[in-house]
Each structure stands twice: as C-alpha cells, then as structure tokens.
Amino acid sequence: VDLDRCYPTAEEMEPKVKGAFAWLDETGSASNECWADYQKKLAAWTANRAKFEAFLADFDEFKERVAPWVKKPEYIADCMHKANAPCRYSVLNFPVDEKTVRWAITYCHLMRNRFSVIDLLHFTGVWNDEFVQMLLDRAEAMDAGL
C-alpha cells in the first residue's frame, strides 16, 4: 500500500464529491451537504494516519481475528434466496434501475461522515469502476444484484 496515495487532500476530493451528487438538484444543496459531511470524514481519516499504519503492520493478525465472523457473499446470497428475500435491486418493493444502482454503489463512500470498509477500499485505490463491475458480476453469478 502506498500510504501517501491513501491520503488525498480536500482540494482533490471536493470536486469529486460535489461532481458525484451535482445531478441530484440544480441548487447544489445536495452536493454541498455531501461535501460538508465528507470533509469531516476525510479530516478524521487524515488525523488517524498512525492508526492506519499500525493496522497495516498487524493486518495478518487482524485477518485471523475476524475470519470466524466474516461470511462469504455466496453464503449470504444463499440465505437470502432460501428466505425468499429480494436479491436484486430490480425486484425491490421500489425497484431501482441499473444506472441508479451503479451510481449509488460507485459513489456511496462519498456521501456521509461515516467510515466504512468501502472508504478503506477507496483510499487504498481498490474501489473503482472495474472493482464495482467485478462486484456486480459476482452478484450476478449468485442470481443477485441488478
């Protein structure tokens, strides 16, 4: 992991965040609200760099510790199918079209001040269009997703 690349500046991220949500309304209030929240998360991420470095140093131990609680997507999809739960965005009570699903998944990490594994994937350079497509393809192979 290139640590320096894991820490974009506010100047780098502001146009990305605002651009992702600009289409939601003409006034820009939605994109401004997302940026207001996101910049807090970005500042906290930057302030905690030493903790991330320690996490990386102990990553193998971390993986062993959490492995018993991590379930494979295939297991979760199988449980959902067995429960007759909706496994596709298109069959929800309020169906979501493919374009909106792709947008929501691609930019979900930019909308709020709540750190998730997707933020970690983004900051380490993993979360991109190709990765999102891989997730959608994997979901499709499980009769889930779009």
PLM features: what roles do these ranges have?
Residues D2-L146:
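C-terminal charged capping/lid subdomain of soluble metabolic enzymes
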